[in-house]
Amino acid sequence: MSLKIRLARAGAKKRPFYHIVVADSRSPRDGKFIERIGTYNPMLPADHEDRIRLVTDRVTHWLSQGAQATDRVARFIGKAGLAPMPAFREQPVQSAPKKKAQERAAERAKAAEA
């Protein structure tokens, strides 16, 4: 059984609230879980103390048992100092113009100068 520490969505429509749970990786996102070990309320300001709540001893217990945290939860655990922060992945620059578009723009600029 592969265990994951992940977010389970709760709360009303347009008002997200998440429980941080330990669950079998095959179970649905909001389905059966083994233990609830914290909460995450994204509606609160980033510096609010109740935005992320973790039961630290249970988090360390499940990590020692081999549970893998998802990317978002791994960042929460890293900020709490219970595990090392995950490596930061660079976001690709998707909106940068491609090579041919840059060449065409350069040609238009030359034509406009002449």
From Swiss-Prot:
Residues 100-114 have a biased composition (Basic and acidic residues). Transmembrane segments: none annotated. Residues 87-114 are annotated as: Disordered. It holds the Pfam family Ribosomal_S16. One of its GO terms (biological process) is translation. The keyword Ribosomal protein applies. The keyword Ribonucleoprotein applies. InterPro entries: Ribosomal_bS16, Ribosomal_bS16_CS, Ribosomal_bS16_dom_sf. It comes from the Bacteria. Belongs to the bacterial ribosomal protein bS16 family. HAMAP family: Ribosomal_bS16. PANTHER family: 30S RIBOSOMAL PROTEIN S16, SMALL RIBOSOMAL SUBUNIT PROTEIN BS16M. This is Small ribosomal subunit protein bS16. It comes from Acidiphilium cryptum (strain JF-5). The gene is rpsP.
